[in-house]
Amino acid sequence: MYLVIVFLGIFYLNKFSAIINRIKKANYYVLGLSFVVFLLFVFINFYIDGNSLNADRWSAMDVTIASILNGEYPYGMKDHLGQTSSNLPALFYIGLPFYFLGDVGLLQPFVFLLISLFLFKSKIAIHKKVIVLFLLLMSPSYLWEIIAKSDLMSNIILLILFLFFWDDKFKNNYFKKPLLLSFFCAFFVLTRGIVVIPLTLFLFRGFLDSNLKTKLKFIVGFTIFSIVICLPILINLPNTETIIEHNPFNHQTKFTPKFVQILFILLPFLIALKRLKIKEKVYYLLILLSILLFVSFAIVCFKFGFDNALYKSYFDISYLGIVLPFTILYFVLDYTKLD
């Protein structure tokens, strides 16, 4: 029934696209509807008690922020489910404004509002804007992110918005502003390790085409900004044994074999050697992410059993939602009209 509703929704939105696109001020109606959804998401966020959830992304972020503000090393602290945080340092900055607003879960509604503003400002056909919002709001994985106060998909959506903004501004030369780009790359890499894959696919070819001075500026800038972003954690480092046992890299990758991690870090570099259009980059990215997630899930199932993988969080199935934003962009958006 669910799939029927989704397919019928897309079918009729396309069928009546000419009528939808001719409606006066339709863009403002879409924005207004999006704002109502935003308010609903805010209400849901405050209505649901995070401590009642069997998902701890929100509390991992909350504990990380609270620990850093209190001058403590965050990766040994326990969240409401008794787990230690795997938040990389940049998530501290993303969640900080919402921590001060009283709930880090507000990140998700505000990222949805940002998507709505992006669609409002873009020159995408009105019916395609509606399809984007329809697919997003009909996605169980996205709605789970809202209800569970998870930051995963919001993290990926922020990355996508940055990549398309950068492509729009510097389409002919991604490395025109190497220092600014190095800051954003360092920031996003320090949110989640998996974002290395899309960043490499989108930017590595441009890095190779840049001159030596630009390359050096980017490398030096990336190194300095990475250190600065990590500084609140670096100044509170405990003893070596604690760091080895409790660190975000260990927590994020403990169930995936090292050879799989290395392989999928290297593959984007090889694919990016070819000159690709932005839609082709998204296509290859979807393939890489899908294979990575499937292989990781299969390995965990083989080692620990299907029940442990699925029901005891040996594999976090919410990571499957990573492909959703890229899938929507690939199948719906007209990339020639993103400016």
For every predicted segment, state its role.
Residues L31-V104:
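Intramembrane catalytic core of multi-pass membrane enzymes that act on lipidic substrates
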Residues M1-F43, I278-I287, L329-D339:
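Start-transfer (signal-anchor) and selected internal transmembrane alpha helices
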Residues P198-T223:
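Perimembrane helix-loop-helix junctions
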Residues F92-Y93, V132-I156:
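Aromatic- and kink-enriched transmembrane "portal" helix at the membrane-lumen/periplasm boundary
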Residues K215-K303:
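Membrane-lumen/periplasm interface segments of specific transmembrane helices
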Residues L96, P140-S141, K177-F204, V228:
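Membrane-interface alpha helices of multi-pass inner-membrane proteins
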Residues V104-H127:
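Transmembrane-helix motifs of polytopic, lipid-linked glycan transferases
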Residues V132, L163-A186:
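Short hydrophobic alpha-helices at membrane interfaces in multi-pass membrane enzymes
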